[in-house]
Each structure stands twice: as C-alpha cells, then as structure tokens.
Amino acid sequence: NKIIARSHNLCEKLIDFTAHAEMQVFTSASNYLQSKYLDKCSLYVTLEPCLMCAGASYWTRIGKIVFGANDPKKGFRNKSTNVLHPKTTIIGPIMEMECSSIIKSFFSDKR
C-alpha cells in the first residue's frame, strides 16, 4: 500500500517512442525494489496499456494492472493473443469518462 514509482508519457519530451508511462514506472519500480520482478506490485494507469507496455509487463510479472479508459486503437486487449503474464490480474475500464477526458487534455497539450 505504498506508491513506489509514478510517471507520465515522456515520448515527446525525450523524443523516444518507448518512453510510455508504464515503461518508466517499470524501470523506476525495479530500481527501487532492486528486482526485475514486480509480482507484488499493482500498476494504475489512465489508459489501457499498448501492446509494447503489456509485453513489458509480462516480463516484470506485475501482479495487477488497473486501467481507466479503453484504447480501441492501440490497447493490448485488441489483440487475439493474451500478452500478459498468466498471474497478472487486469481490472478495467474504471472511471472511463473521467480518464478519457484526462488523456485527451494531456495529449492536446503535448502535440
């Protein structure tokens, strides 16, 4: 019950397509815990993770992912193959309208 890492999308700032919030958090949390496995951790994100971030979550063995808004274009659930670790619990969408509004505002300011 402790926040050990937080971030936001840094793709524009770092000019790096892999600098999604999830990727930043996985690195920070792993450094904090001194472990590449995050099986006792939960990830809370505003938008459904993309395929890249979901794939990275597989390798971290993250315990739970909670997301706010669906991502009908790039979300990992649009793929026929489940890319999450079998022990990862997924919860979402939750507070979808609020989260969609936050995402739209964030990206309109960045792009």
Locate the predicted segments by residue.
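Short beta->alpha transition motifs characteristic of CBS
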Residues: 2-11, 87-89
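Glycine/small-residue-rich phosphate/adenosyl-binding loop
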Residues: 5, 22-32
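A short, polar/charged loop-to-alpha-helix boundary motif
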Residues: 11-24
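Ser/Thr-centric signal marking residues that sit
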Residues: 18, 46, 88
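Short connector loops at helix/strand junctions that flank enzyme active sites
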Residues: 20, 38-40, 60-62
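Immediate flanking context of iron-sulfur cluster ligation sites
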Residues: 35-47
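Zinc-dependent deaminase
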Residues: 49-111
